[in-house]
C-alpha cells in the first residue's frame, strides 16, 4: 500500500466561551463561538458516550490542556477525514491502517493497478477534506460481532480490514466509527463532528 502522510501543527489548544474555559480528561481543541456549540465540545468515546468538558469560571484566561491528548485525537480524526476524502476521489481505494503519529497522521492506501496518488494529487485531497469538514458530519460509533464486522467490511470492499478482523478471536466485538458515508474499524476516540 501507499502511505499518505500529513503533518498537523496545533498551537495553544483551548476551549473558551467568553470567560468560560472548558477542559476534561480527554480534551479536544475547539474554538467555541457561542453557547449553543458547547454541547459539541466533547470527544466521542468507543462506548458511544460523550466525554464532557468541565467548565472553569475564571477571568477569561486560557487554560492549558494536555497537548499530547488534544493533538492525538485531532490527528486521529483528521486521518479518518483524509481517508473519507480519498475514498470519494478514488472509490476503489482500500485502506489498511491510519493512525495519528508524533508529527501528524497517515493512512496506508492500496489502489488498483495503474492508479497512483502523487504529491500533485494532494491539493484535490485537501480540498475534499475541507468539504467534509464543512459538511459538519457527526462521528458515530457502533459495534458488531466478528462475523457481522467481516460481512460489513467485505460489502465495502475493505480487504485489509477483513484480514485484520479475521485474525481476531471468534467472540470479538469490533468497534467502528462512521462519519457520513465513510465507515472505519477503529477503537477511537474521535471528535464529535468533522467541523470543529
Task: Name the predicted role of every residue range.
Residues 59-99, 185-192:
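N-terminal catalytic cores of NTP/NDP-binding nucleotidyl/phosphoryl-transfer enzymes
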Residues 104:
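Short acidic-rich active-site patches of cyclic nucleotide enzymes
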Residues 28-31, 40-45, 49-50, 57:
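Short, positively charged and aromatic/hydrophobic N-terminal segments
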Residues 1-12, 24, 28-40:
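Ser/Thr-rich, low-complexity intrinsically disordered segments
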Residues 54-61, 101, 111-196:
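Non-catalytic interaction/regulatory segments
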Amino acid at each position: 500500500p501507499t502511505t499518505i502522510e500529513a503533518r498537523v501543527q496545533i498551537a495553544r489548544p483551548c476551549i473558551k466561551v467568553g470567560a468560560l474555559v472548558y477542559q476534561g480528561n480527554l480534551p479536544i481543541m475547539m474554538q467555541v463561538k457561542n453557547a449553543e456549540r458547547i454541547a459539541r465540545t466533547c470527544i466521542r468515546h468507543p462506548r458511544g458516550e460523550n466525554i464532557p468538558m468541565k467548565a472553569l469560571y475564571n477571568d477569561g484566561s486560557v487554560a492549558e490542556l494536555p497537548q499530547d491528548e488534544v493533538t492525538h485525537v485531532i490527528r486521529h480524526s483528521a486521518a479518518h477525514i483524509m481517508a473519507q476524502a480519498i475514498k470519494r476521489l478514488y472509490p476503489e481505494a482500500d485502506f489498511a491502517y491510519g493512525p495519528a503519529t508524533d508529527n501528524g497522521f497517515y493512512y496506508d492506501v492500496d489502489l488498483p493497478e495503474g492508479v497512483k496518488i502523487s504529491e500533485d494529487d494532494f491539493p484535490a485531497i485537501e480540498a475534499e477534506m475541507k468539504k467534509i469538514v464543512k459538511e459538519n458530519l457527526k462521528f458515530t460509533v457502533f459495534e458488531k460481532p466478528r462475523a457481522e464486522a467481516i460481512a460489513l467490511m467485505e460489502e465495502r470492499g475493505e480487504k485489509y480490514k477483513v484480514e485484520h478482523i479475521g485474525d481476531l478471536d471468534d467472540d470479538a466485538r469490533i468497534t467502528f466509527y462512521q462519519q457520513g458515508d465513510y465507515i472505519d474499524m477503529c477503537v477511537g476516540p474521535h471528535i464529535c463532528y468533522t467541523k470543529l
